[in-house]
Amino acid sequence: MENIIKGIRQYYPVSDSSLEVLFSYMKKMELPKKHLLIHGGVLDRHVYFIEKGFCRSYCLRDGEEITIWFSREGDITFAMKDLYHNQPGYEYVELLEDCEKYADPD
């Protein structure tokens, strides 16, 4: 979880013991390139921590994919409306590489 720790500590001075508690609740996921991690219109309240890989968040407008942002190793990714408003959002997250991620539990 080296990349995730670096990503977190880039913004927050978190102790090793706090990180251990956080990681004890997380589930490891190894997913292939082109996997759709988050589907628009489907509620997904997870926060995904990226240890390895690269992904893109996008929405559909008139059938066209509009890229919103990219996430890389050490970043987090999630569907904003789903997480903040507990409503299915419009965002999709596609893995652009094979990825190793950690997610909060169901």
Specify the residue positions occupied by each region the protein language model found.
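Cytosolic regulatory regions built on CNB/CRP/Popeye-like sensor folds
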Residues: M1-D106
